[in-house]
Amino acid sequence: NNKCDLEFASSECQMRYQDCGEASNCTALIEECKTSLQEECDQASSESSSTTIRPE
């Protein structure tokens, strides 16, 4: 699981919003997407125990 990898997050988010085009809010959406992927990643690594992480 390489959500933590910034390049992976970037391409994942760009793929997710590829139909969005170059509109200014698309860039914001992509940035937000990258941030949330990285946050998920940080939470996962900080809870390095083997317990399943459940969404809040």
Curated annotation (Swiss-Prot):
Q: What Gene3D superfamilies does this protein map onto?
A: Attractin (1.20.1400.10)
Mind listing the GO biological process terms from this record?
A: sexual reproduction
A Gene Ontology cellular-component term: extracellular region
The UniProt entry, under InterPro entries, shows: Attractin, Attractin_sf
Q: Give the function comment from the record.
A: Water-borne pheromone that attract the marine mollusk Aplysia into breeding aggregations and coordinate male and female reproductive behavior within the aggregation.
Identify the tissues in which this protein is expressed.
Produced by the albumen gland of the egg cordons.
| Official protein name in the record | Attractin
User: One GO molecular function term?
Assistant: mating pheromone activity
Superkingdom is Eukaryota
Key word Secreted present: yes
Chief localization: secreted
User: Does this entry carry the keyword Disulfide bond?
Assistant: yes
Return any one Pfam family short name: Attractin
Glycosylated positions are N25
Which cysteines does the record link by disulfide bonds? C4-C41, C13-C33, C20-C26
Keywords of this entry: Disulfide bond, Glycoprotein, Pheromone, Secreted
According to the record, the signal peptide region is none
Localization: Secreted
